[in-house]
Amino acid sequence: MPRILVVDDEPDLRFLLRRIFERAGHEVTDAGDGAAALRAVRESAPDLVVTDMMMPVMDGPEFIRRLRSEPATAEIPILAVSGDSHLAGAADAVIPKPYQWGHLLEVAGDLLKEGRGLR
């Protein structure tokens, strides 16, 4: 079962994303900011990270930069969801907010199948 880490500072959206991915058959963990997400990735590397870009403590761009700088996490596919898509430069795919759940699942599925090959 693919493991997905959802990173968003909005608890309601995090809950909703968890439910969507769980119903699609994925094991899901979540974090409320980039710093908590880094700790989660180091504890148990996910198969995919789905992250917001604008968060407190550590924002999405910094979180992605740190993931990419560590050999153990550099190849984890990253799907950025953001109202400001130019912030997601190092992500493997970007879905602008607002987005449709079906499209989110489709892009996430492609990243899980092909890894970072979509870049």
Predicted regions, residues:
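Short acidic/polar segment at the start of the alpha1 helix of CheY-like receiver
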Residues: E10-R14
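Hydrophobic/aromatic residues positioned on beta-strands within the core alpha/beta folds
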Residues: L79-V81
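Receiver (REC) domain active-site loop signature in two-component systems and cognate sites
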Residues: M55
